[in-house]
């Protein structure tokens, strides 16, 4: 009986610590350019809720993939976030999920770093390797790293790996 009470108290304390660390307001969007291919990411975290919008457009401005993921996000003291998707949608012209964030894993995990202790310089790293996609015959190795500034579009060039 004493062990059950101690376990219950420990779980309750851990839950409240995770809840305290989860209260944040983060809005981050970034655009990464791989040659003529554009990848865009919007991430909004308010309290423990998150919404993530992601799309990739090819060199002819044709949609490769568009997806939205919504759910609960927990912030850890180390700067790591765990995103637990509760709802998602995905759309692509050929019903292929090339470059999807859903293919990383569920739950998603990411790091949000502040550069030089300034809240407006953000580096986000998604754990996992999203691998390669082929867009119009061009092989592209998708990065798991997004560099950005809150409230602004960031254009970063990456070279394709062939």
From Swiss-Prot:
InterPro entries: PsaF (IPR035182)
Name this polypeptide is given: Protein PsaF
Organism: Yersinia pestis
